[in-house]
Amino acid sequence: MSMDVGVVGLGVMGANLALNIAEKGFKVAVFNRTYSKSEEFMKANASAPFAGNLKAFETMEAFAASLKKPRKALILVQAGAATDSTTEQLKKVFEKGDILVDTGNAHFKDQGRRAQQLEAAGLRFLGMGISGGEEGARKGPAFFPGGTLSVWEEIRPIVEAAAAKADDGRPCVTMNGSGGAGSCVKMYHNSGEYAILQIWGEVFDILRAMGLNNDEVAAVLEDWKSKNFLKSYMLDISIAAARAKDKDGSYLTEHVMDRIGSKGTGLWSAQEALEIGVPAPSLNMAVVSRQFTMYKTERQANASNAPGITQSPGYTLKNKSPSGPEIKQLYDSVCIAIISCYAQMFQCLREMDKVHNFGLNLPATIATFRAGCILQGYLLKPMTEAFEKNPNISNLMCAFQTEIRAGLQNYRDMVALITSKLEVSIPVLSASLNYVTAMFTPTLKYGQLVSLQRDVFGRHGYERVDKDGRESFQWPELQ
């Protein structure tokens, strides 16, 4: 039996992607480190109409021998050491010209390293992130490939068939560029995901602090969803999480430890943004907000050692309906904050493209987020259109200036209310407001003073607005 493509790793993502591809009519060879898992997979799907398109192999040698040449293998194992180990095993059984595709959440620089190592061995490589989770892998995820165009063209028919389709029928995949471009896009996709999930978490915290129960919070979010602007997968899962009940009928949120895990992509994105000098405070604070949660013991000790230090007057809504004035303020705040997060994310990608020469087509990349992935939602369509209309737009927020003008005062008022009346931490909502304010301020006065401060103590010099070059002031000696 000559198989079209191989899948290595039958965890949740690998198993579901293998089923997805097989259902599209391709013959899929599967291999797992433990053959018992492969047997379980085959048994569980023996009655599927496309079961004849699946075949499991006990050894890597048999797996490789089953594949049509040039062989194509999708690697779906844990990023890092497991990926390196799997790659080394495949190198031993694959031949010159064969293709390895790493789909893990890898750092884009690691993908560049793997590509060089494999090319030196005569193999071809593609880094291709996947978004959409278990359901996406099975029904159609978004893919983010990067590497050599000729390699992409060989794997393209399989990937496009398996990908989610947007409303216009276009598959949610595009070749993002050379080297680690695909993994870089996936990194910033995940950083945007971090930030927007955190915004919804902060909204939940705010509304609960204002006296709403979980079902009332969910009702507010349902109303916001009906307005379409915020309609998204992340809003849907926020509503589901708020409504979820434990076995005893109580809200599940009340039994969940407030520690948020992470896989590292958000941190990598924040680090890269800082290194290349792109302001991305919401993406950075989304990482910090998770770090806050990991300090559970310290937070408990602080609250015990200094009781009441964050005590505030409190604020209970008189009108808990979605039409209430404070809820309208919060709605406007969230709309602008999410626009701000996307603006930062895309600005990072634009600058990363300049630094690393990926050859990124940003409108095409954004279009791949419209379905199948965690970021999917209404806003991706007008954002794609904004970049298609003006690829050189100074900042995505300019395309949404009508919404920002209409809601910015409400945003400011809401942040003021939260910080003065509620014991609620809002790291990303506050960072997003600061980003909007800073990026629309032609002259930042603090920039003038701090430039002079640096000249006083370090003779670093400063630029003037009335002539080119740098100069230093003759400062009097300070005691």
UniProtKB/Swiss-Prot annotation:
<dbReference type="InterPro" id="IPR036291">
    <property type="entry name" value="NAD(P)-bd_dom_sf"/>
</dbReference>
<dbReference type="GO" id="GO:0005737">
    <property type="term" value="C:cytoplasm"/>
</dbReference>
<dbReference type="Pfam" id="PF03446">
    <property type="entry name" value="NAD_binding_2"/>
</dbReference>
<feature type="active site" description="Proton acceptor">
    <location>
        <position position="186"/>
    </location>
</feature>
<dbReference type="GO" id="GO:0097014">
    <property type="term" value="C:ciliary plasm"/>
</dbReference>
<feature type="binding site" description="in other chain">
    <location>
        <begin position="131"/>
        <end position="133"/>
    </location>
    <ligand>
        <name>substrate</name>
    </ligand>
</feature>
<feature type="binding site" description="in other chain">
    <location>
        <position position="263"/>
    </location>
    <ligand>
        <name>substrate</name>
    </ligand>
</feature>
<dbReference type="InterPro" id="IPR006114">
    <property type="entry name" value="6PGDH_C"/>
</dbReference>
<dbReference type="GO" id="GO:0020015">
    <property type="term" value="C:glycosome"/>
</dbReference>
<feature type="binding site" description="in other chain">
    <location>
        <position position="194"/>
    </location>
    <ligand>
        <name>substrate</name>
    </ligand>
</feature>
<feature type="binding site">
    <location>
        <begin position="9"/>
        <end position="14"/>
    </location>
    <ligand>
        <name>NADP(+)</name>
    </ligand>
</feature>
<feature type="binding site">
    <location>
        <begin position="32"/>
        <end position="34"/>
    </location>
    <ligand>
        <name>NADP(+)</name>
    </ligand>
</feature>
<feature type="binding site">
    <location>
        <begin position="77"/>
        <end position="79"/>
    </location>
    <ligand>
        <name>NADP(+)</name>
    </ligand>
</feature>
<comment type="similarity">
    <text>Belongs to the 6-phosphogluconate dehydrogenase family.</text>
</comment>
<dbReference type="GO" id="GO:0019521">
    <property type="term" value="P:D-gluconate metabolic process"/>
</dbReference>
<keyword id="KW-0521">NADP</keyword>
<dbReference type="GO" id="GO:0050661">
    <property type="term" value="F:NADP binding"/>
</dbReference>
<protein>
    <recommendedName>
        <fullName>6-phosphogluconate dehydrogenase, decarboxylating</fullName>
        <ecNumber>1.1.1.44</ecNumber>
    </recommendedName>
</protein>
<dbReference type="GO" id="GO:0004616">
    <property type="term" value="F:phosphogluconate dehydrogenase (decarboxylating) activity"/>
</dbReference>
<feature type="binding site" description="in other chain">
    <location>
        <begin position="189"/>
        <end position="190"/>
    </location>
    <ligand>
        <name>substrate</name>
    </ligand>
</feature>
<comment type="subunit">
    <text>Homodimer.</text>
</comment>
<dbReference type="InterPro" id="IPR013328">
    <property type="entry name" value="6PGD_dom2"/>
</dbReference>
<keyword id="KW-0570">Pentose shunt</keyword>
<keyword id="KW-0560">Oxidoreductase</keyword>
<dbReference type="InterPro" id="IPR008927">
    <property type="entry name" value="6-PGluconate_DH-like_C_sf"/>
</dbReference>
<comment type="function">
    <text>Catalyzes the oxidative decarboxylation of 6-phosphogluconate to ribulose 5-phosphate and CO(2), with concomitant reduction of NADP to NADPH.</text>
</comment>
<dbReference type="InterPro" id="IPR006183">
    <property type="entry name" value="Pgluconate_DH"/>
</dbReference>
<keyword id="KW-0311">Gluconate utilization</keyword>
<feature type="binding site">
    <location>
        <position position="460"/>
    </location>
    <ligand>
        <name>substrate</name>
    </ligand>
</feature>
<comment type="pathway">
    <text>Carbohydrate degradation; pentose phosphate pathway; D-ribulose 5-phosphate from D-glucose 6-phosphate (oxidative stage): step 3/3.</text>
</comment>
<feature type="binding site">
    <location>
        <position position="454"/>
    </location>
    <ligand>
        <name>substrate</name>
    </ligand>
</feature>
<dbReference type="GO" id="GO:0006098">
    <property type="term" value="P:pentose-phosphate shunt"/>
</dbReference>
<feature type="active site" description="Proton donor">
    <location>
        <position position="193"/>
    </location>
</feature>
<feature type="binding site">
    <location>
        <position position="105"/>
    </location>
    <ligand>
        <name>NADP(+)</name>
    </ligand>
</feature>
<dbReference type="Pfam" id="PF00393">
    <property type="entry name" value="6PGD"/>
</dbReference>
<dbReference type="InterPro" id="IPR006184">
    <property type="entry name" value="6PGdom_BS"/>
</dbReference>
<feature type="binding site" description="in other chain">
    <location>
        <position position="290"/>
    </location>
    <ligand>
        <name>substrate</name>
    </ligand>
</feature>
<dbReference type="InterPro" id="IPR006115">
    <property type="entry name" value="6PGDH_NADP-bd"/>
</dbReference>
<dbReference type="InterPro" id="IPR006113">
    <property type="entry name" value="6PGDH_Gnd/GntZ"/>
</dbReference>
<feature type="binding site" description="in other chain">
    <location>
        <position position="105"/>
    </location>
    <ligand>
        <name>substrate</name>
    </ligand>
</feature>
